[in-house]
Amino acid sequence: MGLPWYRVHTVVLNDPGRLLSVHIMHTALVAGWAGSMALYELAVFDPSDPVLDPMWRQGMFVIPFMTRLGITNSWGGWSITGGTITNPGIWSYEGVAGAHIVFSGLCFLAAIWHWVYWDLEIFCDERTGKPSLDLPKIFGIHLFLSGVACFGFGAFHVTGLYGPGIWVSDPCGLTGKVQPVNPAWGVEGFDPFVPGGIASHHIAAGTLGILAGLFHLSVRPPQRLYKGLRMGNIETVLSSSIAAVFFAAFVVAGTMWYGSATTPIELFGPTRYQWDQGYFQQEIYRRVSAGLAENQSLSEAWSKIPEKLAFYDYIGNNPAKGGLFRAGSMDNGDGIAVGWLGHPIFRDKDGRELFVRRMPTFFETFPVVLVDGDGIVRADVPFRRAESKYSVEQVGVTVEFYGGELNGVSYSDPATVKKYARRAQLGEIFELDRATLKSDGVFRSSPRGWFTFGHASFALLFFFGHIWHGARTLFRDVFAGIDPDLDAQVEFGAFQKLGDPTTRRQVV
């Protein structure tokens, strides 16, 4: 046929059987990729430390999505929450991966069958004897079936009525586990961080989909609307489908980047806004203050801070710190976290407590500045020593650790104090193993960042695809050069102005 690469899809334009075939093959490729990717991730995933080396630090992409839907165990005998298990059941990580691969194989065979047996009676219009599809009817069928699936997911899977529930956690991502969720029918269901909204919205949207599907199955579109929206043209279906996909992609890019109940930080890592707003730092200080109010010592109060919470309060876990094109997991960047050294508290020679100003998200380097409780600069690491007034040496800064591995240890040596002041810019201080993976020390983004970038980028491309195909189908006659109102053959010389019937030349 000699089609250019960008026109090859015209071969299925008027061939319903093979149109179905290529869509089944597409499903086979998607399911096959998902299953294969899951097996690859399981082969390289280390489940030994869910606190300091969770899935998102290791760059896992499909494991978090399986986990949020209720999969927590492996046939390898481990659980995502730590510890060992003896009976993971069929729906383990490997079971889900295998199911996708088997499904992919079946779709592959079905696609071949439909490619070979394309000329089926079901695709033949009785009136014309030509292949055709009743697109409004197919729309109704798809709407009804997707509504049933949506309702079933919300009413059974999420609620635990017939299924495991979903991943639910606290606002600080410490106590996450899979559990049934009751639908939230009040105004709280519209809070993106309330898991109950997931159940209620799926039930409501599914019900609407079922009713809308039945409506489109039982009511034919008016002729004027049918013609106006080109409902008989398969490119109309393509255009509106692309619209649905790009809209969904924009929505999930937002829920992933800004955070929601559907994207728990235990599975995808924290958001950049939690670093920008000092979210975990505030929670840590709140807990320490509560401990001091109960007459605990500073050391005791800091020792009770969960290592998991302290680890969230570290800039290396901020998804906006990694460059978009820096390949690899977070562990390949700053290394594998081994342990929390503790919280450093700096004091000057007058005993005044000093706080290191933290690095903002979009800085690669940042001056080391120590301020007191009123925000007044009291010490720094100067760029020019000759002009310094606040250097660590001049101010006599010391550091003492509370909690963590260095609990109770203090340093007054200026070089050591400056080292820990620099590290305190990055949040809580952790010992990082950069040797095992030959980590290069350059921050990487988490799967939260990759997902957002990928979906926002493709949503933009698909938006243009929607405009393109929508214009093609709505203005098909214009692009084809065929005017339905044309009553005379347009030819050179027939009119004084080409195509203008009011300027017809007079025949002498």
UniProtKB/Swiss-Prot annotation:
Cellular compartment(s): Plastid, Chloroplast thylakoid membrane
Gene3D superfamilies hit by this protein: Photosystem II CP47 reaction center protein
One GO-annotated biological process of the protein: photosynthetic electron transport in photosystem II
Recorded GO CC terms: chloroplast thylakoid membrane; photosystem II
Molecular-function GO term, any one: chlorophyll binding
Cofactor binding summary note: Binds multiple chlorophylls. PSII binds additional chlorophylls, carotenoids and specific lipids.
Membrane topology label: Multi-pass membrane protein
Membrane-spanning segments: 21-36, 101-115, 140-156, 203-218, 237-252, 457-472
InterPro entries, per the entry: PS_antenna-like, PS_II_antenna-like_sf, PSII_PsbB
Signal peptide stretch: none
Keywords: Chlorophyll, Chloroplast, Chromophore, Membrane, Photosynthesis, Photosystem II, Plastid, Thylakoid, Transmembrane, Transmembrane helix
Subunit-level organization: PSII is composed of 1 copy each of membrane proteins PsbA, PsbB, PsbC, PsbD, PsbE, PsbF, PsbH, PsbI, PsbJ, PsbK, PsbL, PsbM, PsbT, PsbX, PsbY, PsbZ, Psb30/Ycf12, at least 3 peripheral proteins of the oxygen-evolving complex and a large number of cofactors. It forms dimeric complexes.
NCBIfam families per the UniProt record, alphabetical: PS_II_CP47 (TIGR03039)
Function (record text): One of the components of the core complex of photosystem II (PSII). It binds chlorophyll and helps catalyze the primary light-induced photochemical processes of PSII. PSII is a light-driven water:plastoquinone oxidoreductase, using light energy to abstract electrons from H(2)O, generating O(2) and a proton gradient subsequently used for ATP formation.
Family: Belongs to the PsbB/PsbC family. PsbB subfamily.
Annotated protein name in UniProt: Photosystem II CP47 reaction center protein
